[in-house]
Regions:
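C-terminal binding/interaction regions
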Residues: 9-18, 94-131
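Short, structured active-site "lid" loops
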Residues: 50-72
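Short, Lys/Arg-enriched N-terminal segments with co-localized hydrophobic residues
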Residues: 1-5
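A short beta-strand-loop structural module common to alpha/beta enzyme folds
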Residues: 33-44
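Mid-chain, well-packed structural core segment of small domains
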Residues: 68-69, 74-114
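Short, solvent-exposed amphipathic alpha-helices that sit
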Residues: 18-30
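Short active-site oxyanion
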Residues: 7-8, 63-66, 85-87
């Protein structure tokens, strides 16, 4: 598998919608396929449900990695880490993204839709996907 042809599962709740759409664009620009388990609306969504679907896709090897977005990223991280074989990392900066891959072999990236701006999202996702 080349680093440029991964299947990336995406999931978000209502608070992570805008950030998920930004992440989806970044993932596509980097040449990866997106499998979207998240919501496309602003109505309330139970984050554990969508986190589980995306994490299960990684666990079953239907996706190579996953990126999950909710308000803080904490809930998605907790929910995803309940799935066997998943190593979800909540990352708020570039160093977290790099270390989570290099030292922890994370296969799920959890992000905050409320706390991260577009530039930070881009850098974190790019580093995490290329490390």
């Amino acid at each position: 598998m080349s680093i440029c042809d991964m299947k990336i599962a995406l999931a978000n709740d209502h608070r992570g919608l805008e950030a998920k759409e930004q992440v989806k664009a970044i993932v596509s620009q980097l040449g990866h396929e997106c499998i979207d388990f998240g919501t496309d609306g602003e109505g309330p969504v139970d984050y554990p449900d969508v986190a589980y679907q995306a994490a299960k896709a990684v666990s079953k090897q239907d996706a190579d990695r996953a990126i999950l977005v909710c308000g803080t990223g904490i809930g998605m991280s907790i929910a995803a880490n309940k799935v066997r074989g998943v190593r979800a990392a909540l990352c708020y900066d570039e160093l977290n993204a790099k270390v989570s891959r290099n030292h922890n072999d994370s296969n799920v990236l959890c992000l905050s839709g409320d706390l991260l701006g577009a530039q930070a999202l881009r850098k974190i996702v790019e580093i995490w996907l290329t490390t």
